[in-house]
Amino acid sequence: MTSVEELRACALLQDCADQLSVLGNIIRPGAETQQRTELHLKTAQLMAGSSLSNFSGELKSQKHFKIQQTLLASDNLAKVQKDRQFVSDVINALLEELQKKNNFQSLFSAVAEERKKKAELLDIINREEEGRRQIKKLQKQLLDIRKEKTEECERLEEEVAILKDQVQDMRVRTNQQGKFVKSCAEQLVYQESKHNSYKENELEDEVKMLQEKIEEEKNVHFETEAFLKQQHANLKQKLQYWIHRYEKDMEEKEQEITALQNKRNSSQTRIQDLSKKCKDMENVVIEDRIEKEHLRAQMEKEQREKNAATKIQAWWRGTLVRKGPRSKKADKSKKKDGKKGKKKRK
């Protein structure tokens, strides 16, 4: 970059920095903001150099229109101030680097940093999607666990009902058997006592044997009933345990879902903020590119005008050089003709 181009670029950047500084001073919350904005913008325009006024006129009008629209809302003042400060820092760093090193490396660094922030934003979005998939997976697991526990509870209830029915059937069967055996024994004793007396002892032994069997059946019945009651108590205890465990698992899963939802909401808020910042940075880069394009066009125009002026000056000098001897000869011939005319008159 030549020294003239460097000076022009520095002047343009200084003009932008001054305007941003003035813009930062005029951003005030309250009823006077809208009235002061136009006055400060006019002051910033008067501070710019006359040589760059035509080039930056369109850009100033666009900024003036955007600022008038944005500053009317009090909620956007902080955001505008932050964006203005970022643009001012980028322009000041670029101006300082241009003056010292005659390059635009800081601008490239700012663009690279914004790209890095955009990559981080995409990473956050990917993590958010992974969190959503994890939530869906946990919800599916919770539904499966709930279904499994419900089926197990129903199965245990069916087993308890079956055991109750078995106990009742055994109790009825035992009572019927006892009554039947007793009636049979009495009938046999009565018949045997009538028909044959010598069989009395045998029948008594048989009655005793039957009574022992009845007692044994009763003992078996009592033991079976106690065993079934114990099994019923154990199953009931297991049922209470599984119900408690089911409620505990449900509470833990709900806490995990709540934590994931809170994390998702926080990530969404951060993503929205980063999206706004990314859009603002893209607008800043676009405006900077437009400024560079305008500066390049202005420099090409000035170079063409300079070349044209040089050609015109060279052509004019050549014309003067060619016409110089001819004008001297014409003056001498005019003088001779004047002398001859005077002699004839005499």
Swiss-Prot record:
| Start-end of Basic and acidic residues biased regions | 299-308
Task: Tell me where it resides.
Answer: Cytoplasm; Cell projection, Cilium, Flagellum; Cell projection, Cilium; Cytoplasm, Cytoskeleton
| PROSITE patterns reported for this sequence | IQ
Question: Among the record's GO biological process terms, what is one?
Answer: cilium organization
**Sequence segments annotated as region (Disordered):** 299-346
Q: Where is the composition biased (Basic residues)?
A: 323-346
Q: Which residues form a coiled coil?
A: none
Q: What is its main location?
A: cytoplasm
- Superkingdom is Eukaryota
The UniProt disruption phenotype note reads: Morpholino knockdown of the protein leads to a severe reduction in the size of the caudal hematopoietic tissue at 72 hpf, a strong reduction in the number of myb-positive hematopoietic stem cells, and results in impaired definitive hematopoiesis. Contrary to wild-type, the expression of monocyte, macrophage and lymphoblast markers is strongly reduced. Likewise, hemoglobin levels are strongly reduced, suggesting impaired erythropoiesis.
Q: Which UniProt keywords apply?
A: Calmodulin-binding, Cell projection, Cilium, Cytoplasm, Cytoskeleton, Differentiation, Flagellum
**SS bond list:** none
Q: What is known of its domains?
A: The IQ domain mediates interaction with calmodulin when cellular Ca(2+) levels are low.
Family listed: Belongs to the DRC9 family.
Query: What is the annotated quaternary arrangement, including any partners?
Result: Component of the nexin-dynein regulatory complex (N-DRC). Interacts (via IQ domain) with calmodulin when calcium levels are low. Does not interact with calmodulin in the presence of Ca(2+). Interacts with hsp70 and may form a complex with camk4 and hsp70.
PANTHER family from the UniProt entry: DYNEIN REGULATORY COMPLEX PROTEIN 9 (PTHR14871:SF1)
The name this protein goes by in its record: Dynein regulatory complex protein 9
Source species of the chain: Danio rerio
By which gene is this protein encoded? Answer: iqcg
